[in-house]
Design a protein with these regions (language model features):
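Aromatic-residue-lined binding/catalytic grooves and analogous aromatic/hydrophobic interfacial grooves
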Residues: 1-231
């Protein structure tokens, strides 16, 4: 089961295997500049996984270990030399974690939380000097990603989630749309709703959902200090 909560800007994946219920929660915090992923289950010691990063095929870079539980990928695009850095750190409850050959291997953990930060050295220069090869070169992504990651890990999952929700909800909850409060369509999956809608079945809730989905996308893709949504 895959869920996207528009109210909290969180993605959730739920599945069962060998009578164990697994859940994976994902959110990206704008205030903290971090992607957070929590893998949990309804029984202890069931987190067995390997985490690795697939590099961009149009860039050249290297992966190095960062301590016992982290990875750092530093690279530059082949066409314009723009530098970027991706950092990953895993925090586990129970079990073991091995950091080897660019992979984080977790065995027998109760829970795993991954923190991911990424940045480039691109600078939005609105008065560029095209004779200067560094006119669009800004911050050092090694430094920014390192600071963001350290801050995120220090805060921990619960504090980051609360900060993320407060930041997002302050924008998302400003608008409510209710086209027909007397019509209820139950908890049909969105895919089934779309099929019914194409066949001419009215679904006011689906129209409300798509309106709010558009707002979610805009809030998630364009904030002060960042690029506009179309970029």
């Amino acid at each position: 089961k895959r869920i996207l909560s528009l109210d909290s800007a969180m993605a959730v994946v739920q599945f069962k295997k060998d009578d164990v219920a697994y859940q994976r929660n994902y959110f990206i915090s704008y205030p903290a500049n971090v992607l957070v992923m929590r893998f949990s289950a309804d029984r202890p010691g069931k987190q067995n996984l390997i985490f690795s990063y697939a590099p961009n095929p149009v860039s050249t870079g290297s992966m190095v270990a960062q301590g016992d539980n982290g990875l750092v990928y530093s690279a530059a695009l082949d066409n314009n030399g723009m530098k970027y850095v991706v950092r990953i750190q895993a925090e586990t409850k129970g079990g073991t974690l091995v950091n080897r050959n660019g992979k984080l291997t977790v065995k027998g953990a109760d829970e795993v939380v991954f923190y991911v930060t990424a940045d480039t050295d691109y600078k939005a220069n609105f008065a560029p000097d095209f004779k200067n090869p560094k006119t669009y070169v800004g911050v050092n992504p090694v430094e920014t990603t390192g600071q963001w990651l350290a801050n995120a890990v220090a805060k921990g999952y619960s504090a980051l989630l609360n900060e993320h929700y407060q930041d997002y909800a302050a924008l998302f909850n400003r608008v409510k749309l209710n086209l027909n409060p007397t019509v209820k369509t139950g908890n049909l999956p969105t895919g089934q709703r779309l099929k019914n809608y194409r066949k001419g079945q009215p679904d006011y809730y689906l129209e409300e959902l798509y309106f709010q989905f558009g707002r979610y996308l805009l809030i998630a893709s364009s904030r002060p200090g960042n690029m506009p949504a179309n970029l």
